[in-house]
């Protein structure tokens, strides 16, 4: 069908679909929402040719072949037609025309690659003389798992193979790379520089059970499980540890500071919800849900109940009744977009949308009106904004939606440039004022240079923490961190400030450049209760049952 009746709730969204998709008899479409995306479901293998006299029977199932947004941009999935990976997604084309290749491997290919790696290592004079330390890597995986059949196919790398903005640039390395254990579990993730950024360890006796994980440059977190596979302990180096105890519809969580929380649950499967929470200070909060698992009421630690009224069909929030009886009401249009909010004092804010469902006008509760203008019916982002006093600012974007130029109310224009990774490499302001940015292979900002050639440089740790800033005159300021990435000292101009933390990551002491100290104390809910200043004076804080500061 080329067109839907104009009164149909999906009529506008239907027009956003490519004509070939709308007219195809072999494609199913499913709308995620009245303003959102179409999910395109096609044949799992080949599509019958138009001239086939007796086309084959329709398939028993359909696979996701694309996602079309409300402006006609398509995210297309390309699947392997043959081989061991037949039917698997091996390519993606995004709405801007960029093409990505998903490199897949089988268990046998990974095993062969490891054998070649071992052979090369053994033949190298500097390599080990025995491979006995390496565990066996089988050519196949067990056919059946508790999640179904495992064909052993895994994602090895993601490559950007074509970028319309940079058609002549060919990739030399993948955007991301993945390695796996002999059991097919994800072992490590590498970024485009080849640096490992994530690592995982698994239980040798329980396939797929993760027992440790870490980020680059950060300490490892480890997990222990009970006989049913539930986590019973999480151990975090240089941080808080947690113990988990499971009862009937109850989970008790105790940290290494001996703080205890209890979560009480109701429901089963995907509808299980936390209906009561006992906090470390003994206070209790409650939550209520409807049959669909949607939040309908909450009671705070002081016993005050807030009620959410939901639309029976859409589930949209229509009103909130506050503990004192005051009500906030919400209105929607036929596309289920928020159009109004009426506050307890009678004031009202409102929104208007254009035919494409884009925000066109917003009136605040004090009467100020902001308007948005778009360059074309297929633009999802505004090209101009007019504020409450009639001042207009213009915005130009590149094909990827990034800000390319901004013109303020006086006509002053600022222009922006980006590299192929989407990183901002230049900002050009009026009168020749420009800033140029440099990045390393991991995408971290390493330098900024102005139009006069004055450069500021930046250095980082393996974890990505900024460790040094070198100004154009050569002066160097440094920041030191603990293993968890928290700054423990800042040195600038030969003077140092330092910070100390407790196991929960709360700052407990500040030492300034002349050695004076400021100390901090907290309660079991991490609220600041006492501060001893650099001058030696002490200030204390008290809170209500709901966490509001009531005395200082």
Placement of each model-derived feature along the sequence:
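Extended charged/polar low-complexity repeat regions
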Residues: 1-552
